Amino acid sequence: MQKQNSFTFEELLSCGRGEMFGEGNAQLPLPPMLMFDRIVSITEEGGQYGNGQIVAELDVRPDLWFFNCHFAGDPVMPGCLGLDAMWQLVGFYLGWMGGKGRGRALGAGDVKFTGQVLPTGKLITYRIDLKRVIMRKLVMGIADAHMEIDGREIYVASDLRVGLFTRTDNF
């Protein structure tokens, strides 16, 4: 049976409610912290390293929650939200691959911001290239990620790490 290779906003909400991968397993945050509207493509192979890739998108609207508070009179998307979206996507990938446990961001190598998302932007595109996927007792993904606004790359993160944990009380 072939895995589903794209996901609508409604399906992402189902994942956020814990309905997609089963109770206690990988789960996306719900809005407003869910930082993408759809997964355009997700593959086990391909991408820069041949170990899988995710492409997701967020439609930029002037009424997005963060523009009203970051900053008054100078609205800009916080860079940490774009970075969090990248971690969210790596965690989703691990659940999609059948990994068990709750997702936790474990770190990143270099993170670079070379641009900004303003309310006048139209489309954010995230591209996550899996470097390594470990599916043993330890479930972990290591990926490089790129974020574009309207086709222009503005964020790059290397060696993003996300793990799935069956116990988080001692984390």
Curated annotation (Swiss-Prot):
It catalyses: a (3R)-hydroxyacyl-[ACP] = a (2E)-enoyl-[ACP] + H2O; (3R)-hydroxydecanoyl-[ACP] = (2E)-decenoyl-[ACP] + H2O; (2E)-decenoyl-[ACP] = (3Z)-decenoyl-[ACP]. GO terms for biological process: unsaturated fatty acid biosynthetic process. The active site is at 70. GO terms for cellular component: cytoplasm. Coiled coil: none annotated. GO terms for molecular function: (3R)-hydroxyacyl-[acyl-carrier-protein] dehydratase activity; trans-2-decenoyl-acyl-carrier-protein isomerase activity. This is 3-hydroxydecanoyl-[acyl-carrier-protein] dehydratase. It comes from Methylobacillus flagellatus (strain ATCC 51484 / DSM 6875 / VKM B-1610 / KT). The lineage of its organism: Bacteria, Pseudomonadati, Pseudomonadota, Betaproteobacteria, Nitrosomonadales.
